[in-house]
Design a protein with these regions (language model features):
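Extracytoplasmic/lumenal domain signature
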Residues: 1-151
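Glycine-centered coil/turn sites that cap beta-strands in beta-rich domains
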Residues: 154-177
Length: 177
């Protein structure tokens, strides 16, 4: 899956994703390039949607993901590995992690669903206030949206769509018969 976060604090969002190329990517859609230090080779494919939060209260987001084979990874915003990671989860991971202070002790826990059951990693550092994408599709409603609207004031012809058009849609959502 794809998640969205302003990893480099430039005011625009980057796209974070993993896949069958064994890499975790952080792509800047404005520049059309990966951020410096990214992608990172995890040496195995991943089915998780990366999640982001300030795990160590330094003001920067950390990126959390896992390999399908059961290794959890955490990277700082600049692509450097978090201390003591990767860490084995003891089972295959085919879902996205979730981040939150589930025990109310002031630090984050990261929950992974594995083939061996739920695994919880307790991050024993004061948690920061920044949480961008802390679970699958970004929120409990699974909207996959930050609630933002793309607005353009560019008047150059052809850049902004002037009409909505659907062609050769199958199955047709407007005429299901």
């Amino acid at each position: 899956g794809i998640s969205v976060a302003d990893l480099n604090d430039d005011g625009s969002y980057e796209l974070l994703f993993t896949g069958y190329d064994d890499m975790i990517h952080v792509w800047n859609p404005i520049d059309g390039e990966e951020l410096e230090g990214w992608p990172i080779d995890m040496e195995s494919n991943s089915l998780t949607e990366p999640v982001t939060a300030d795990l160590d209260n330094d003001g920067d987001l950390e990126v959390v993901t896992a390999r399908k084979s059961g290794l959890a990874y955490i990277f700082h915003h600049d692509a450097t590995p978090y201390n003591n990671f990767p860490a084995s989860l003891g089972g295959n991971v085919e879902s996205s992690p979730a981040i939150g202070d589930i025990d109310g002790d002031g630090d984050f826990e990261i929950v992974f669903g594995t083939t061996a059951g739920l695994k919880v990693l307790d991050i024993k550092e004061d948690m920061g206030e920044r949480v961008s994408w802390k679970l699958h599709r970004g929120n409990l409603e699974r909207t996959g949206s930050l609630g933002m609207t793309l607005v353009s004031n560019d008047r150059e012809e052809g850049l902004t769509p002037s009409e909505f058009y659907v062609s050769a849609n199958y199955p047709n959502p407007f005429n299901p018969s």
